[in-house]
From Swiss-Prot:
The name this protein goes by in its record: 11-beta-hydroxysteroid dehydrogenase type 2
Gene: HSD11B2
Record key words, sorted: Endoplasmic reticulum, Lipid metabolism, Microsome, NAD, Oxidoreductase, Steroid metabolism
Molecular function via GO: 11-beta-hydroxysteroid dehydrogenase (NAD+) activity
Organism: Bos taurus (Bovine)
Tissues expressed in: Highly expressed in kidney, adrenal and colon; detected at lower levels on lung, liver, and spleen. Expressed in oocytes. Expressed in uterine tissues and in corpora lutea.
Segments for region (Disordered): 383-404
Positions annotated to bind substrate: 219
Binding residues annotated for NAD(+), in chain numbering: 82-111
GO BP term, pick one: glucocorticoid metabolic process
């Protein structure tokens, strides 16, 4: 097909014009992303000249250039000014790191901790400004929640509270849902769901007054059935759905709601191998004899070993999560969901677009290898993998994959 240079020229006039305007407003991120975008446009230009009519080529090039430059625009940020933010779960991990960053940015930070004498609390007291206030709170105790809510109402400016960061969370046991006591599910719901619900409802009058932000740290375990995280994942699923409701209902008030879905990061609780060993022993000590005989102690040992191995590969740098929380608090148009960390795109793609059998097999191989309980083993001593049992049984008449 005949080459048409004028669509190319028209598009390359429009794109640099917008880029120049963004540069003048300091609204364009420079560096490798910009170079990659220009290379993409050049390749697309070459294809359009050879494959499309002139008007179609101009439309495709101009639209692509406009979209690319929009994605490269620096997100507009609101000034910190005298904004106040309350963060739960600041003893360690994401909450602790976020409290320190927001304090350095000039926020008034109300940081709740489980223990005022914990290492994380002492660190915050030592390194942060006098604007940061430490508040003791256990989300399973209504009295603690009421005290923090009352303190916040008294000590926030007349404009109200700008942001609430629901960060506190808990995971207790790593085991099949049948092996976890019902009390474990209740505890996870109390901390991860009902605690966040009470804090959000209690602070909504202040947040509505300021047209502020609600930022909630959830988990991919609430979106997909990771093996052996049923209690934790169920509570996070309920939490994410609740925040979706708040997002719709608070829209007329100007309150924006964001959910953070981080990958696995190396927080203090993740690194605490002794804690996971203690919880495993606690589970074994309280497990009914019938379940212990059916599953076997070696099965639970294996699950915890695999879980600790997966945690050893956790991401050490917490800044992507802290940056996501900060953006949700200050961006003029924050995202509804943030996915900080590597590998989440692939996991969500598999979860949403592949057949259910493949999804379940992937989650098992990604997180915990499919070893079988003692009662299902084929008579061999020790652990036997599901693959070994399948080989012993010979080929099945139905070759279609089944979920483990």
């Amino acid at each position: 097909m005949e080459s048409w240079p004028w669509p190319s020229g028209g598009a390359w006039l429009l794109v640099p014009a917008r880029a120049l305007l963004q540069l003048l407003r300091a609204d364009l991120r420079l560096g490798r992303p910009l170079l990659a975008a220009l290379a993409l446009l050049a390749a697309l230009d070459w294809l359009c000249q050879r494959l499309l009519p002139p008007l179609a080529a101009l439309a495709v090039l101009a639209a692509t250039g406009w979209i690319v430059l929009s994605r490269l625009a620096r997100p507009q940020r609101l000034p910190v000014a005298t904004r106040a933010v309350l963060i739960t779960g600041c003893d360690s991990g994401f909450g602790n790191a976020t409290a320190k960053k927001l304090d350095t940015m000039g926020f008034t930070v109300l940081a709740t901790v489980l223990d005022l004498n914990s290492p994380g609390a002492l660190e915050l007291r030592a390194c942060c400004s006098s604007r940061l206030k430490l508040l003791q709170m256990d989300l399973t105790k209504p009295g603690d929640i009421s005290r923090v809510l009352e303190f916040t109402k008294v000590h926030t400016p007349s404009t109200g509270l700008w942001g609430l960061v629901n960060n506190a969370g808990q995971n207790i046991f790593v085991a099949d849902a049948e092996l976890c006591p019902v009390a474990t599910f209740r505890t996870c719901m109390e901390v991860n769901f009902f605690g966040a619900l009470e804090m959000t409802k209690g602070l909504l009058p202040l947040l509505r007054r300021s047209s502020g932000r609600i930022v909630t740290v959830s988990s991919p375990a609430g979106d997909m059935p990771f093996p052996c995280l049923a209690a934790y994942g169920t509570s996070k699923a309920a939490l994410a759905l609740l925040m979706g409701n708040f997002s719709c209902e608070l829209l007329p008030w100007g309150v924006k709601v964001s959910i953070i879905q981080p990958a696995c990061f190396k927080t203090e609780s993740v690194k605490d191998v002794h804690q996971w060993e203690e919880r495993k022993q606690q589970l074994l000590a309280t497990l009914p004899q019938e379940l212990l005989q059916a599953y076997g102690e070696d099965y639970i040992e294996h699950l915890n070993g695999q879980f600790l191995h997966s945690l050893s590969q956790a991401l050490p740098d917490l800044s992507p999560v802290v940056d996501a929380i900060t953006d949700a608090l200050l961006a003029a148009q924050p995202l509804r969901r943030y996915y900080p960390g590597h590998g989440l795109g692939l996991i969500y793609f598999i979860h949403y677009y592949l057949p259910e059998g493949l999804r379940q097999r992937f989650l098992q191989s990604f997180f915990i290898s499919p070893y079988v309980p003692r009662a299902l083993q084929a008579g061999q001593p020790g652990l036997t993998s599901a693959r070994d049992i399948a080989q012993d049984q010979g080929p099945r008449p139905d070759p279609s994959p089944t979920a483990q």
